[in-house]
Amino acid sequence: MTERNTSTDSPEKRAAGIAAAGLVSSGMLVGLGTGSTVAYTIKELGRRVREEGLDILGVVTSYQSEMLAIEAGIRLTTLAQHPELDLAIDGADQIDSELRAIKGGGAAHTREKIVSVSARRFVVVADESKTSKQLDKLVPVEVLPFAKEPVVKKIRELGGKPQLRSAVKKDGPVITDNGNFVLDVEFGVIKDPEALALQLSSIPGVVEHGIFCNVSELYIGNKDGAIKIITRQK
């Protein structure tokens, strides 16, 4: 089987992705995230399915991860059939010292969040470049096209600077797997991610935003293959 080449090889991402795959055992229901680091997790799980007889069911967060999982030989299910998962594994665009994350660079954050909160344990895989003391990157906000301008107005009232995400290989805006637009919002340093998350969620027309405050553990990969594991403090 020829697997899709998902990204330029990265020792750090590979180390983190493969280490997280080691958390999975037969009988598990596993949420499979989207992005270059979790692609290594999906490939490793596929190897274990083929070579070790690993028996799992995966729930994917995007068409990209669905294609990777199918190519890897992972059997898939849905949240409609299995609304509670044992584990979800995903990447992040940025994650702070208290394991609050920004996700959504791939415009899949709505499904990623639904899958992550459906899991008993949510593990983020990343390299050191994604870690930061505080969150300060652009926050993706998925919005209904009908509500774009009212949402832009409300976000500006919160101090944000929203920009409609444009597609790279076609004219017009990025359209999510759910058929919506994405606003990339600059807030500067986000001093209280939990509060901002609640404010964004309360805006009518916002489908979901990219602030994740439910990460259980962070697996950070290094070039030498070593892994640093950080667990959320209770």
UniProtKB/Swiss-Prot annotation:
Catalytic activity, EC: 5.3.1.6
Residues that hold substrate according to the record: 34-37, 90-93, 103-106, 130
InterPro entries according to UniProt: NagB/RpiA_transferase-like, Ribose5P_isomerase_typA_subgr, Ribose5P_isomerase_type_A
Entry keyword annotation includes Isomerase: yes
Complex formation: Homodimer.
Function of the protein: Catalyzes the reversible conversion of ribose-5-phosphate to ribulose 5-phosphate.
Protein family (similarity comment): Belongs to the ribose 5-phosphate isomerase family.
Name of protein: Ribose-5-phosphate isomerase A
Organism per entry: Methanosarcina acetivorans (strain ATCC 35395 / DSM 2834 / JCM 12185 / C2A)
Gene encoding the protein: rpiA
